[in-house]
Amino acid sequence: ACDCTDRITSQRAQYLKSIGINYVGRYITGYWAVSISEISLILEAGMKFVPIFERSGNDLSGNMDVTDASYFTHEQGRQDALYAASTAQELGLPENTTIYFAVDFDAYDFEVDSNILEYFRALSVYLLHYNVGIYGPRNVCTRVSNAGYAKTSYVADMSTGFSGNIGVRIPSNWAFDQFYETSYGSGDSQINIDKVM
């Protein structure tokens, strides 16, 4: 598997499949939002699409910082659940698809307690027709999943310096484990990806 911010073209989709990629993760919102045509190319190449939610660019209002614990509130979880569901429907994602909500920073236990659990509690209430997944460091994935707020985990193991990854077992509900950034291909098929297993 892999995830990327590069646009998926026909050449890139065929190349990824040829090197053994079966799942492609892409953001559904923000700067690098996937398009319906990209999803079609992924599926037509015989791969599966993995939706990741994280606000960026025009998705943000005011001084929001999605890499800070203060972003993760109950109200923000409610808003993000509604936005993610609406976007998933527009993209034609089937019901019961798992959407991975990103906690893309080294969150400490006190931040998980004060903010992140409340955010995911709201997601679990307000995200209708889709499943809540979590993308983040091992500790955050484990804590949120053990609280019953995420069905599966997409582990940010590439961030080896995160305290939430050091000496922490991979969550028992892990579906994806991101571990290495690289570039593949050449010409029209060249693409930068994060390797995932």
PLM segments and residue spans:
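Functionally critical loop-and-helix segments that line ligand-binding/catalytic clefts
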Residues: 1-4, 13, 141, 146-197
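Hydrophobic faces of well-ordered beta-strands that scaffold small-molecule active sites
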Residues: 1-4, 23-26, 47-52, 97-99, ...
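N-terminal module-boundary/linker segments of secreted carbohydrate-active enzymes
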Residues: 1-23
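Substrate-binding cleft of extracellular glycoside hydrolase catalytic domains
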Residues: 4-7, 26-106
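Generic structural signal for well-ordered alpha-helices
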Residues: 13, 39, 81-85, 117-124
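Extracytoplasmic/secreted cell-surface and envelope-processing proteins
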Residues: 32-35, 59-63, 108-114, 142-145, ...
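Active-site cleft segment of glycoside hydrolase catalytic domains centered on the general acid/base Glu
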Residues: 107-130
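Aromatic-lined carbohydrate-recognition surfaces of secreted/lumenal glycan-active proteins
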Residues: 128-143, 151
